[in-house]
From Swiss-Prot:
Pfam families in the cross-refs: GTP_cyclohydroI
Family: Belongs to the GTP cyclohydrolase I family.
This protein's name: GTP cyclohydrolase 1
GO biological process: one-carbon metabolic process; tetrahydrobiopterin biosynthetic process; tetrahydrofolate biosynthetic process
NCBIfam families assigned: folE, PRK09347.1-1, PRK09347.1-3
Amino acid sequence: MALSEAAVKVQAALLERGLETPMLPSVYSSEERKDKIEHHMKEILTLMSLDLSDDSLADTPRRIAKMYVDEIFSGLDYENFPKITVIDNKMGFDEMVRVQDISLTSTCEHHLVTIDGTATIAYLPRKKIIGLSKINRIVRFFAQRPQVQERLTQQVLVALQTLLETKDVAVKMDAVHYCVKSRGVMDSTSSTTTTALGGIFKSNPATRAEFLHQ
């Protein structure tokens, strides 16, 4: 299946900036990946002394394989990049467009546990305007990978800058990391905030403040 024009542009922009998720070219189909993950997951669970003949566990390796490929790591495959609707800004709209409280669930690439949070996105329209739901879908696409929050924030910024043909984009993410909450230090109250600012959001203090403190 050929990649969409939007997917090709975004991937190229991330590679150029050194912001692409570290990954190898895939040599397997989705079903082949599921079969191999299922096989190895059986070995892992058996090494953990779990009895896979039990009704509750028998299908767990396959469920995990399907979850990895079709859901929580589906953003590793650019064939899943969302269909993007970008239109010419014929009405000359030039005020800030802001979408806040976008829910995101990702996976920490260090321990493969949950990152749970929200994103706020803003841009100043220039030549192009994007369908609002597409912003949410772009966040979700890049969240559905093993991630670090700093890179995720930058990936969403670059994707929107590329598609909107403007640097004037800002991204803010607030998230709870379960690698901190459920293991290690086991801090159940802390959260992490990251920002990525481009164009006027970086150069103009008033615009930056409006985005960050609204």
